[in-house]
Amino acid sequence: MAKVRITQVRSTIKCPMRQKLTIKALKLGRINKSVELEFTPQIQGMVRQVHHLVTTENIA
């Protein structure tokens, strides 16, 4: 399974609670914090929900 690096680039202030909970589920919470996760369909859906708050990079 492919791995992906997800980095939070924008704050969750003034975001709906659902997006804040999604950021927390992705193990993020601070600007410029990064995590490396397996790119499963579940993670892909979470990233799609908060695409305006995060950036993604594929890891070989």
UniProtKB/Swiss-Prot annotation:
NCBIfam families: rpmD_bact (TIGR01308). It comes from the Bacteria. It comes from Amoebophilus asiaticus (strain 5a2). InterPro entries: Ribo_uL30_ferredoxin-like_sf, Ribosomal_uL30_bac-type, Ribosomal_uL30_ferredoxin-like. HAMAP family: Ribosomal_uL30_B (MF_01371_B). One of its GO terms (cellular component) is cytosolic large ribosomal subunit. The keyword Phosphoprotein does not apply. Signal peptide: none annotated. This is Large ribosomal subunit protein uL30. Belongs to the universal ribosomal protein uL30 family. GO terms for molecular function: structural constituent of ribosome.
